[in-house]
Regions:
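Switch/communication elements of ASCE P-loop NTPase nucleotide-binding domains
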Residues: 1-127, 146
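Acidic, divalent-metal-binding catalytic cores of TOPRIM
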Residues: 91-316
């Protein structure tokens, strides 16, 4: 069926090319032609979808077709076209259609928008492009959140796939580039509910002219304000989106939180299943987990700068 569809579309395109040819049609040549293709991915494997898309783009570039309209649910197709060529139709409410125009959202006269557009375009692949088709999105910083969130949801008797919720790994704190696409305060944005999960990552810097922020433990936060300046990550974002109509920022507890991995270990401090053979201090951690007394645990710790900081914080 896929090849039959291609043959049929090729015949239609050949006729359109002939109809627009002055040499062939003389004065009857059609000067304005549009091509509309619905669900071109039907029965076509990804490589053939790319090939067909390239064929259409070549026809437009050569002037055989003035404009091409294509409807698609293919992530391969979406990831292969430019952002300015996309129009995203969503239905946040039954009977209501929202139209999103990425080419309008990212303004060419704004340097920040240009940088964001370039990043999003590089980021999109056949997997990430699924964000245009999901009903709701959860943006996360890394692979741990991407893998574990669906598992945590199942423990709560929720299935993210059934709810059409997609977890998107940003590979870092690059939320701002993508939030422009979905910020409903801006016209022509794509209307979806967005959650951004980010690590609170407490940090501190010495009160010196050339001081730089460095990561610190939650129990070290604000204990030496005379010599250090402290801050948490995402304070601005959490406040900025607290009352936003479709975007929210969430992070760990201010008192105890640091990262997802840190919190998992803190809540399951005697669970050896969390340890892998690649951990450099595997024996040390297993020995500490075997103890129930804090002082005995500290006695199993190796001498290092990080462990000294931990012991000092516990003692104080």
């Amino acid at each position: 069926l896929g090849y039959n569809n291609l043959i049929y579309m090729s015949l239609l395109l050949a006729k359109m090319q002939a109809d627009s040819s002055i040499i062939y049609m003389k004065r009857n040549a059609k000067v304005l032609s549009f091509l509309a293709v619905e669900e071109c991915e039907a029965h076509l494997h990804p490589a053939m979808q790319y090939k067909f898309l390239q064929f259409l783009q070549d026809n437009k570039a050569n002037g055989h077709v003035r404009q091409i309209f294509m409807t698609s649910h293919s992530t391969q197709i979406v990831s292969a076209v430019k952002l300015e060529d996309l129009i995203c139709l969503t239905s946040p409410v039954l009977g209501q259609i929202n139209v999103g125009y990425p080419r309008i959202i990212y303004r060419e006269d704004n340097a920040d928008d240009v940088a964001s557009k370039q990043y999003v375009q590089r980021f999109l692949d056949a997997t990430k492009a699924d964000m245009f088709f999901a009903n709701k999105l959860i943006f996360v910083e890394g692979i741990a959140e991407e893998l574990l969130l669906p598992v945590f949801a199942r423990y709560l008797n929720k299935n993210l796939t059934d709810e059409h919720v997609l977890v998107v790994n940003m590979g870092g704190r690059y939320f701002n580039h993508f939030l422009k696409l979905f910020d409903t305060k801006n016209p022509y944005s794509i209307n979806k509910k967005i959650v951004c999960l980010t690590d609170i990552d407490p940090c501190r810097k010495k009160n010196e002219p050339d001081g730089e922020y460095e990561s610190c433990y939650p129990y070290e936060y604000d204990i030496d304000t005379a010599n250090y300046d402290y801050k948490h990550h995402a304070d601005t974002e959490v406040a900025q989106y607290a009352a936003h109509p479709n975007i929210r920022f969430y992070r760990q507890d201010v008192t105890y939180g640091k990262t997802l991995e840190y919190d998992i270990m803190r809540e399951n401090s005697d669970c050896e299943l969390l340890l892998t053979n690649s951990v450099s201090n595997l024996k040390e951690l297993k020995a500490m987990m075997a103890e129930q007394d804090v002082n005995k645990m500290m006695g199993k710790m190796r001498n290092s700068e990080a462990n000294t900081r931990i012991k000092t914080s516990i003692d104080t």
